Amino acid sequence: DGAILFDYAQAEGMTHFGTSAKFIDAIAKIDLRPAKTHDLSSLRAMFSTGSPLVPEGFDYVYAHVKGDIQLASISGGTDIISCFVLGNPNGPGYRGEIQCAGLGMATDVFDDAGVPVRGQKGELVCTRPFPVMPIGFWNDPQGFKYRAAYFERFDNVWCHGDFAERTIHDGFIIYGRSDATLNPGGVRIGTAEIYRQVEKLEEVMEALVIGQDWPPEAPSDVRVVLFVRLRDGLVLDDALIARIKQVIRENTTPRHVPAK
């Protein structure tokens, strides 16, 4: 029951609501409208994490949860007990973007050569030490595993493993984990780019996309394979498959279209 968290928010006079992008997508799919059914007058901010919050998620929250709320998509990690990128109540917010780097975080995006880039996809990095940076791992006295985990990609630069973009607004867009990035024909594609298109469709409740080495007997490329869970009673027929592929192609590129 998606309404139960809003029941708590109303009963407790909640001011800050932490949730996930997947929860926001799920309650949008069932057309939940807390703004009409609950008293959320005390609610000042909503934080979304766990996966990228798509622009349509921003639209839904402001239309059907609360119009005068700070909606902040945030991203960091358990290992740093913090966020590299988060919200700022004093700054503008743009749909589909994370507002800014966290305090004390020299967050940036590097291309494959280790050069900072704007408006293009690359690796999310932190270029300087930060207050909550772990200094090592247990049972790793020489620090080999620690360095391999964070500093192997770029010398003396923390590479967090997120495929991201720094925008012209100094905000950030995260497209997924780097190790889950698809690479058909040598083109890097973030999984969130495909999820955003597929999950727009009313027929689709959930989706999972993978990259499969292809052909199996002598892999020379990666093919994109998409799994979908439909609303109860629906069937994945040729017409729906064609529509899914059409939506992806029209809103991204032919490279994003699943082979299967």
Residues covered by each model-derived region:
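Short, intrinsically disordered, charge-balanced linker/junction segments flanking boundaries
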Residues: 1, 22, 253-260
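Short coil-to-beta-strand transition motifs
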Residues: 98-104, 158
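Gly/Ser/Thr-rich phosphate-binding loop
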Residues: 6, 11-19, 28-93, 106, ...
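Conserved ATP/PPi-binding loop(s) of AMP-dependent carboxylate-activating enzymes
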Residues: 102, 115-154, 189-190
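Hydrophobic beta-strand positions
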Residues: 108-109, 165
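Short, P/G- and charge-enriched loop/turn segments at secondary-structure junctions
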Residues: 91-97, 148-152
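AMP-binding/adenylate-forming catalytic core of the ANL superfamily
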Residues: 10, 17, 130, 135, ...
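Generic beta-strand/beta-sheet core signal
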Residues: 17-20, 48-49, 74, 83-87, ...
